[in-house]
Amino acid sequence: MAVSEQPTGIDELLERVREGLDRVEPPEAFEAAADGALLVDIRYAALRDRDGLIPGALVVERNELEWRLDPLGSHRAPEATGHDLRVVVVCDEGYASSLAAASLRQLGLHRATDLVGGFQAWRAQGLPVRVPETAE
């Protein structure tokens, strides 16, 4: 991604980034995970502790995402099996995840995308959530 000479606001940046993503709604993400897609939860710990986790999702905080998902990287997670891996990035409300998915695409993960509405939309759809023990 080239650096623009003109200042770009976050709304414009998000719009531009999302043009290159095939974003998925929560039910589609649930089905994709059942078919082998990797859901990656990039929310920070306080949000995960407060709201819970998506069962089976890989937790990688945003500041480590590229290092953990780069199939060629020395710090990659075992789940980072190759550039053809279908990755669905999940943040809290579906904003940061768009930027994160675009970054993964720049690393060659050409099937990376994000979850529309993030974790909050997933939970609102009644999809599985594992509530942390501390929140019970």
Language-model regions: role of each:
Residues M1-L38, A45-R86, E93-E136:
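Rhodanese-like catalytic fold shared by cysteine-dependent sulfurtransferases
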